[in-house]
């Protein structure tokens, strides 16, 4: 690799150029490779931080349809480490300046974008231009406009785009959805969803240019997602309150946030998130004749369920990342839609912007 590495922060400066180059996607898309029958799809990880290192890369060993084929990083030392650990050939190692060269690499079918939130559009657009399908970590981006750019880029390239909503594949969450849809306890009335932790001082998540916001964009999105898929509806109204007890550490973002969603069918969801304390990890739904809950609810493992009639059957955990990658690979190979498309990420961003507006103004915001 002779091309100089480009850092994530440097990449922020070139986002406009990436969006402007969309008209040239078509020609490159025509060269995109589709996986041959019987082989696993090759994934390239863009961004080699803690999530990729500790969760996603190990998950490949548990997949049936995926393999780690390449990496994209702005840090040469990481490239060397990953090359040695995962036996990645030099031709499958890229930096953020050379992503377009993936267009000529049939080893790579999918780019899994795991960079900071504010870089997702840049890296997704580059991957789509290279003719690759994209799985992008949540939140999809930092604004609805950026999300739409990502959707448009992948559509123009005729490539699939999915958002890394791992809990859509977790059996405990799927059981809660079943209990709600089948009205096991009658009609749903209220949802409580909360998730947060105490964040350290030196985190890219405290840089608003990269994160787009505070805990809402990071872990609060899980509570928002849960409210949406448990209710089975899209919220109509939102109100919110923001708390900042440490204005130095959280100088340009929320420290803690609570919000209420009102759904068309009458369900109310009370949600909370924080960056100031831990032990905040629960989902509970109340219906006419009982309730069901997950506590802890949103982690990579150890999710525990309970229901008011005592009939919750323990469900063995899975590797959520392996499940989401396998599902996306199958969607690509079978040419069927993913249940977590870019439009799902766009909906979350629109709601989160409304939550921020409600917290800032103190007024109820309409989402219809």
Where are the language model's segments positioned?
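N-terminal secretory signal peptides and thylakoid transit peptides that target proteins
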Residues: 1-19
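C-terminal helical cap and adjacent loop that interface with cofactors, partners, or active-site loops
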Residues: 15-18, 311-368
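N-terminal Rossmann-like dinucleotide-binding module
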Residues: 15-87
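Predominantly a Rossmann-like dinucleotide-binding segment in NAD(P)-dependent oxidoreductases
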Residues: 39, 51-52, 160, 167-251, ...
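Hydrophobic residues in well-ordered beta-strands that form the structural core
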Residues: 45, 95, 136, 161-163, ...
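Conserved SAM-binding strand-loop segment of SAM-dependent methyltransferases
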Residues: 91-97
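Beta-strand-loop-alpha-helix segment that lines the small-molecule cofactor/substrate pocket
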Residues: 109-110, 116-117, 121-168
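NAD(P)-dinucleotide binding in Rossmann-like oxidoreductases
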Residues: 247-254, 262-325, 341
